Amino acid sequence: MTFIVDGHLTFDNLLPFLANWYDRRAIVNSIILACAVGFAGTIIGFIFAFAVTRLSLPKWLTFFISAVTLLPLISPPFTSSIALTLCLGPNGIILTALGLENFNFFGFWGTFISETLTYFPIAFMTLSTILMRIDPNLEDAAYSLGASPFNVFKSVTFPLSVPGLANAFLLVFSCSLADFATPLVLGG
């Protein structure tokens, strides 16, 4: 399929593809999955980034959380789907141990869980940088004016991290949309 025919831009080759209901449904499902993974991955990444950058944790725990969070980036995306299949598949280790026989891990939810676990480290890295760059004096000023920790988060930290949240969402969304192997393995 090409958009350039005889030197001119045309969408004529795209129309038969979009006329097929099955192809349109695949596009819609991919966008829905990518939005869900982007949203969930950004939330989880923000929680981990906030814990590492803003909470008073021991250095070893901060290092451990950061290292474990980045592990999914080391392996290809399909390895997490294979690992989750071994754990949560029909004869999976966890389902067998829990005695759950009718649990179906394949389909949308299995793909969603696998991609979220695979791609949330991207949001973690993006948001860790954003949260580290927020000037602590702004939060200290809010505390000195009598704001509670929740109000400081709500009125200072969160608004300043919104551009990073948008960036993290777009990165996780695009990675999920581009992933072919995970839906192939877990799509059902």
Give residue ranges: language-model regions:
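The DNA-contacting recognition helix of HTH DNA-binding domains
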Residues: F124, P149-F150
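Glycine/proline-centered hinge or cleavage motifs at structural transition points of membrane proteins
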Residues: L145-G146, P159
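Membrane-water interface segments at the C-terminal ends of transmembrane alpha-helices
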Residues: M1-G7, A19-M132, F158-A181, G187
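Short amphipathic alpha-helical coupling elements at transmembrane boundaries
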Residues: D12-A19, F63-S66, P136-S144, S155
